[in-house]
């Protein structure tokens, strides 16, 4: 009994040390990306229209016909509204474009968690390569994530979603169809809808939505299907409404709608 109690205490002590090391790693990443979000180089398009579009939203909200003043304002992005909301200009007298850095931090924590899981299981999976790819992308954009460019927002959201998606798939790929989870994939699909409102060119990734859709249809979860469709429309509606008000088109610069 004494030996078992001693072994239990040793296990608890080891777990606390590992847990403390993980939290220290995340704290270090937070400081690193806070530093990266405070200085660096601006994306060319930020000087051209990103920063101005965000400032327009800060000062006036949605301005009908704004794309007539500058055609680039028609490239509406959900990231601009998010950046305007968290710019906190009133606090220091100038905007703090730090949301891209926060998204980068989330992606970095996801990559770190993936690599720690690899170190623990000592077995290579597809998700491990995605974690390495995410780290390379973060290194590439580190000096420019101070810029509120929609390109960075979209890529960071996609990296996070795809890494999470593949990890889920790896965990249950041998499960029968009826036992596969639907909620995590459906919720990740809502993030993909948001990514499409950040950068319209990412809309092709919405094809992944077919996977949870098929699972839900096979399991005949009609109420959940209706709920997820409603949430997707709720996410997309503000973006579509701003498009119509700013440019007159539903999907600028495409003029067929």
Where are the model-predicted features located?
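Active-site lumenal/periplasmic loops and adjacent helix-entry segments of GT-C-fold
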Residues: 33-127, 145-147
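Membrane-lumen/periplasm interface segments of specific transmembrane helices
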Residues: 38-41, 82, 225-257
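Membrane-interface alpha helices of multi-pass inner-membrane proteins
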Residues: 142-143, 184-200, 204-211, 234, ...
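Short hydrophobic alpha-helices at membrane interfaces in multi-pass membrane enzymes
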Residues: 168-194
């Amino acid at each position: 009994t004494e030996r078992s109690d001693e072994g239990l205490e040793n296990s608890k002590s080891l777990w606390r040390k590992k847990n403390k090391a993980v939290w220290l790693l995340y704290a270090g990443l937070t400081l690193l990306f806070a530093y990266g979000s405070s200085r660096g180089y601006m994306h060319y398009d930020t000087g051209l229209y990103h920063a101005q579009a965000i400032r327009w939203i800060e000062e006036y909200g949605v301005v009908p016909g704004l794309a007539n003043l500058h055609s680039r304002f028609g490239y509406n992005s959900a990231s601009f509204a998010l950046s305007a909301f968290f710019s906190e200009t009133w606090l220091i007298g100038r905007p703090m474009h730090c949301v891209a850095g926060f998204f980068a931090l989330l992606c970095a924590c996801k990559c770190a968690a993936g690599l720690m899981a690899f170190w623990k299981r000592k077995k290579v999976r597809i998700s491990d390569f995605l974690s390495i790819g995410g780290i390379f992308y973060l290194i590439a954009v580190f000096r420019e994530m101070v810029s509120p460019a929609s390109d960075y927002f979209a890529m960071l959201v996609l990296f996070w979603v795809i890494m999470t998606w593949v990890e889920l798939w790896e965990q249950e790929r041998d499960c029968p169809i009826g036992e596969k989870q639907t909620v995590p994939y459906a919720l990740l699909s809502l993030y993909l809808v948001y990514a499409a409102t950040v950068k319209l060119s990412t809309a092709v990734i919405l094809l992944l939505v077919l996977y949870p859709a098929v699972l839900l249809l096979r399991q005949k979860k009609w109420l959940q299907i209706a709920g997820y469709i409603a949430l997707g429309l709720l996410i997309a509606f503000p973006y579509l409404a701003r498009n119509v008000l700013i440019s007159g088109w539903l999907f600028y610069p495409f003029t067929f709608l």
